[in-house]
């Protein structure tokens, strides 16, 4: 039995799955936590990866491995391959001003969307490089190469110390602001616009490219950004829109068309198969449920029970969930807000319901944006930690207006990386067709009132800088 390894280095933790390359059956797995924060030294990821690999029984017997990970994080290296400073992660919004400046300098969002498929916001890598150049010039002067979290971990696994050997894949490169998914080329002119000079950048590999080898000689796949890996790991069919409710919320679908959205709502990323992955991202997803549970002093099961005990629309109470600023819409300094607080709605059930509906309304807005840019949307595949909430599962169909499928809980990002590794080991034009467990299906009639209430309230928020 040939084995493959899939690695997911996420914001919170590192997961390693070892699967049968032919069937996809899980053989063993490991996990280790990452430190909190929006600024983390990559050595912490490497330490967690080693712990997770050890818990998973090692990689000596695998035929191939691939690493997927959180996107956009700026890993800045000097000429010797040493980390210059802790990585600024996707959820670090200090570069919001840099993003606004970059939009203006190129002539507007439409110019960026046409050039690289995405419009600058604080999440994307180039904005962090601009922030570094302006705010830490001594560190900026040391930078010889820049890469992303999964690139760096793959490079470390290969044993190389030469920055010229760093590799990446289309999906992760497409979130940098200096690589075009449409042309499959770097835009070094945009890198120089943002950072002031050129840098060594990872080679961008195709779906089955080899990024290096493990000590046992097994090939390392190109890896992927977390959302692209999740799309591969769920085995989504054409027209299946994946809604992932993790730290961030993501709505995405594989497509043959690269969207161009000058407003920046829909990001024109690439997927793991040579196609495109239009995606809408919100900064506030499962953390909204965490915050509501904390505020009410209950666990998540009780939060779900409370939410389902209140009527649809929460009798007019609306929670706008911009708890840590927001990326979609682009409001990095916004705060959350509760509207419609009356004597009737002043109880835990209404607040719980408003929290679930507010989070889902933000994601439903993302679905609308994908469809407006040509995406096919037949069903919703709901994954991530937030999908474990019974309230989320039962309320979602009324907001999305489509059947909602919930696969069994799993490590879909790591599974996608493992499936890619099996593809690299086997070769061929398509990834292996692994069998999957049947999902639970939830259906309900749409309730337009909920979306209408949210639309009326979402612009009435307070800027945290005032």
UniProtKB/Swiss-Prot annotation:
GO terms for molecular function: ATP binding; D-xylulokinase activity. It catalyses: D-xylulose + ATP = D-xylulose 5-phosphate + ADP + H(+). Pfam families: FGGY_C, FGGY_N. Keywords: ATP-binding, Carbohydrate metabolism, Kinase, Nucleotide-binding, Transferase, Xylose metabolism. Its EC number is 2.7.1.17. The active site is at residue 226. One of its GO terms (biological process) is xylulose catabolic process. Substrate binds at residues 71-72. The record marks 8 as: Important for activity. The keyword Phosphoprotein does not apply. Catalyzes the phosphorylation of D-xylulose to D-xylulose 5-phosphate. HAMAP family: XylB (MF_02220). This is Xylulose kinase. The lineage of its organism: Bacteria, Bacillati, Actinomycetota, Actinomycetes, Micromonosporales. The gene is xylB.
